[in-house]
Amino acid sequence: MCYNKFMNIRTITTANQIHLENETVLVLGYFDGLHLGHQELFKKARQIADEKGLKVALLTFPESPKLAFVRYQPELLLHLQSPEDRFQKLNELGVDELFLIDFTTDFASKTAKEFVDQFVKALRARVLIAGFDYSFGSDKKTASDLSAYFDGQVGVISPVLDQGEKISSTRIRQAVLEGRVKEAARLLGHPLSSRGIVVHGDARGRTIGYPTANLAPIDRTYLPSDGVYVVDVDFKGQTYRGMAS
C-alpha cells in the first residue's frame, strides 16, 4: 500500500486549535515503529475512508506517553524511527491529517468522556479505529469502551501474529537491542534505519585497505548491540552496500 497525497502535519496544545473541513476516520494510538500490526489499523482506516468519502486523521504524540507516568529513564526518549521516517511512513499509509500533541499531565488528566467530547468531536470523526490494546482517559478505559462514548462506527483491530507471537513495539525494541536486526525488520515490515553525520576518526581502516566512515547519530533511535552488520547506505541520492560495526 502506498498513498502519495500530501499529508498535513499540525502540532497542537488544545482541541480548540483543530479546524477541519471534512469528516474523518480517526486513528488513535502512539505507534512507535509503525510495524505490521500498526499498519493493519491504517489499512482499515484508509479502506473505510475511501468507501465513505472521508479523510484519514491521526491524533498521536511525538514522545512516549509513559513519560507522564513512570520514573524518567533515558531510553524512554528513544524511538524505532526518526520523526521524518515516521511522517513519511504515515503518508504512505494514507493519513491525510496528522495532529501531534504532547502527552502532558494536563492531557493525561482528562477523562474518557472529556477526551471524546473535546478531541474526537473536534476532529470530526465519523469512524474510530484503534488497536485491541488501546487505552484512553484518566479513568483508564479500553478500546472496547469507545462505543460507550462515541455514537459513530468503532473498529478495534485484533493483534497481528508472527510465529504465533504478537507483533509489538516492545518485541521489536528487544530484537534490536539484542542485534536481531533481520527479525526486527521482518516485524516492522520495513528496514531498520538510523541517520548520522560523518565525523573524523582515527583513520585505522585506511591502514588495512578498508577506509571507513564514522557516524555520529543525529536521531534518538534504538541502535543494535555491538556487532558487524550488512547495511545499505543512502548518500547523496545513491544507495551503497556496506558494513557497519
Predicted features along the sequence, with ranges:
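Positively charged, low-complexity intrinsically disordered leader regions
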Residues: 3-25
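N-terminal catalytic cores of NTP/NDP-binding nucleotidyl/phosphoryl-transfer enzymes
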Residues: 17-82
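Residue-level signal for inorganic ion chemistry
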Residues: 35, 90, 128, 184, ...
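A conserved beta-strand->alpha-helix junction
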Residues: 60-62, 93, 98-106, 158
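Glycine-rich, highly charged phosphate/nucleotide-binding loops
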Residues: 77-86, 108-115
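A glycine-rich helix N-cap at a beta->alpha junction
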Residues: 80-99
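Classical nucleotidyltransferase
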Residues: 106-211, 226
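Phosphate/ribose-recognition catalytic cores of enzymes acting on nucleotide-derived substrates
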Residues: 201-245
